[in-house]
């Protein structure tokens, strides 16, 4: 049974399972500058607003981000979004972003950074109305190679 719910510190075991599973591209995860401890720290932040998708209690997808509220206006920064390969192209990432949108009636903008060579992700974001707003030169280091990041945003 597929369920979507807010992530908590209690889900750290699920992240450990996901990272050691064959479905998770651990090298890409590390190249993005993330580790399990950073995820746990994110889940404990006051600004954390993150969701996970579970299949029979196993984490198969997640969105990590910060919700920033400034005078009744909200902005959300997607820090990391991931879907296990076997669950891709099933609308799960879109459902996660929709959940962020529906839970925040004052939301004015969602923004993120994506590696310029991650064409699949860029197509996905464009399809759901994200627009390129900037380029950050040499932002990511993937397999020892510097990659530009596209900053993208969706405004409401």
Where are the language model's segments positioned?
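Conserved glycine-rich acetyl-CoA-binding loop
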Residues: 84-98, 115-123, 127-128
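C-terminal "cap" of GNAT-fold acetyltransferases
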Residues: 115-119, 138-156
């Amino acid at each position: 049974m597929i369920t979507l719910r807010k992530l908590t510190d209690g889900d750290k075991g699920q992240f450990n399972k996901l990272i050691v599973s064959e479905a998770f591209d651990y090298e890409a995860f590390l190249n993005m500058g993330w580790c399990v401890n950073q995820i746990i720290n994110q889940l404990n932040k006051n600004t954390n607003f993150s969701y996970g998708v579970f299949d029979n209690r196993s984490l198969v997808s997640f969105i990590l981000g910060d919700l920033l509220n400034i005078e009744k206006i909200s902005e959300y920064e997607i820090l990391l979004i991931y879907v296990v390969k076997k669950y891709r192209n099933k609308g799960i990432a879109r459902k996660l972003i929709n959940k962020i949108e529906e839970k925040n009636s004052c939301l004015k903008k969602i923004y993120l950074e994506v590696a310029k060579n991650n064409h699949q992700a860029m197509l996905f974001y464009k399809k759901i109305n994200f627009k390129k707003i900037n380029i950050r030169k040499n932002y990511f280091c993937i397999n020892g190679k510097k990659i530009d990041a596209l900053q993208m945003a969706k405004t409401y």
